[in-house]
């Protein structure tokens, strides 16, 4: 059972052929595969491995049931059985891509509001009074996954002939925020 965040197709297109080649075994005959992406947030005391719903999948319907049952015996929040390994891989990579893009949007708004002389936190507090406003805050993208995972999806998209403009624009903006923040801090000194 793979848990790493990868682009859709990585498990079956890249990992499985290596196992077949090195072992001499045949996929879905001699061995099977499952995929269930990790969803933990390092340092988060509330959302722990057992309290976050787990997406599961398997290389056959029977293996999908086995993987789902295995995690279901551990995860108190429950499981969601995806229809395929690729669907589970895609679900995970878009979770992180969506977070990255939401942070990029707020970062861009913070730059604009700064240039307009408007306090971004005040704007976000006011906007947050609407029930469906997503409460993101400007800042640097951290962790081992959010700043990298969108590139996995972007690479796969480009391999199939699509240029993911929004995903890459979000990455460019978030990648530039370190320099922007440093410049603003120096101005305050």
Over which residues does each language-model region extend?
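Structural/interface elements that position substrates and couple domains in central-metabolism enzymes
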Residues: 2-189
């Amino acid at each position: 059972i793979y848990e790493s965040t990868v682009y859709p197709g990585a498990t079956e297109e890249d990992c499985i052929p290596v196992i077949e080649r090195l072992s001499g075994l045949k996929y879905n005959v001699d061995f099977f595969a499952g995929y269930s992406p990790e969803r933990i947030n390092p340092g988060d005391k509330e959302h722990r491995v057992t309290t976050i719903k787990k997406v599961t999948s398997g290389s056959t319907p029977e293996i999908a049931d086995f993987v789902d049952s295995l995690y279901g015996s551990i995860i108190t929040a429950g499981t969601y059985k995806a229809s395929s390994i690729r669907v589970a891989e895609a679900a995970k990579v878009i979770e992180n891509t969506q977070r990255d893009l939401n942070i990029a949007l707020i970062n861009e708004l913070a730059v604009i509001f700064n240039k307009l002389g408007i306090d971004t936190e005040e704007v976000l507090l006011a906007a947050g009074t609407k029930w469906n406003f997503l409460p993101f805050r400007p800042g640097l993208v951290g962790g081992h996954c959010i700043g990298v995972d969108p590139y996995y999806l972007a690479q796969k998209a480009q391999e199939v002939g699509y240029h993911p403009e929004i995903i890459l624009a979000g990455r460019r903006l978030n990648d530039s925020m370190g320099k922007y923040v440093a410049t603003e801090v120096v101005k305050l000194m």
